[in-house]
């Protein structure tokens, strides 16, 4: 057995022992639904005044109107 093969065998053995140890410590228990919601919950955000807006409901002011930008183009922006 050469050095590379021995290293691979030790790496696999350490991985197997680590997985068994994690399983005994509850490392592979599934998340509860509340935990998943807490982890992936998005905080409510809104688009501030003067920024472009695709929809009215995303503006902090709940108002999105067409305005002329610095290039003379009509763009929707939050009021």
Curated annotation (Swiss-Prot):
Matches recorded under InterPro entries: Omega-atracotox
GO CC annotations, alphabetized: extracellular region
Annotated SUPFAM superfamilies: omega toxin-like (SSF57059)
Primary localization: secreted
Keywords: Calcium channel impairing toxin, Cleavage on pair of basic residues, Disulfide bond, Ion channel impairing toxin, Knottin, Secreted, Signal, Toxin, Voltage-gated calcium channel impairing toxin
Key word Secreted present: yes
Any one Gene Ontology molecular-function term assigned to this protein's record: calcium channel inhibitor activity
GO biological process: defense response
Tissue distribution of the protein: Expressed by the venom gland.
Disulfide linkage: 46-60, 53-64, 59-78
Top-rank taxon: Eukaryota
Signal sequence extent: 1-22
Propeptide residues according to the Swiss-Prot or TrEMBL record: 23-40
Keyword Signal: yes
A Pfam family per the record: Omega-toxin
Annotated site residues (Critical for insecticidal activity) in this chain: 52, 69
Location in or out of the cell: Secreted
Entry remark concerning the domains of this protein: The presence of a 'disulfide through disulfide knot' structurally defines this protein as a knottin.
Function comment: Inhibits insect, but not mammalian, voltage-gated calcium channels (Cav).
Family assignment from sequence similarity: Belongs to the neurotoxin 08 (Shiva) family. 01 (omega toxin) subfamily.
Name of this protein: Omega-hexatoxin-Hi1f
């Amino acid at each position: 057995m050469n050095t590379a093969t021995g290293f691979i065998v030790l790496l696999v053995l350490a991985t197997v022992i680590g997985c068994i140890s994690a399983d005994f410590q509850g490392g592979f228990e599934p998340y509860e639904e509340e935990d998943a919601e807490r982890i992936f919950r998005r905080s409510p955000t809104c688009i501030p005044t003067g920024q472009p807006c695709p929809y009215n409901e995303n503006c902090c002011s709940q108002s999105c109107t067409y305005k002329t930008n610095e290039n003379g183009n009509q763009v929707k922006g939050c009021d």
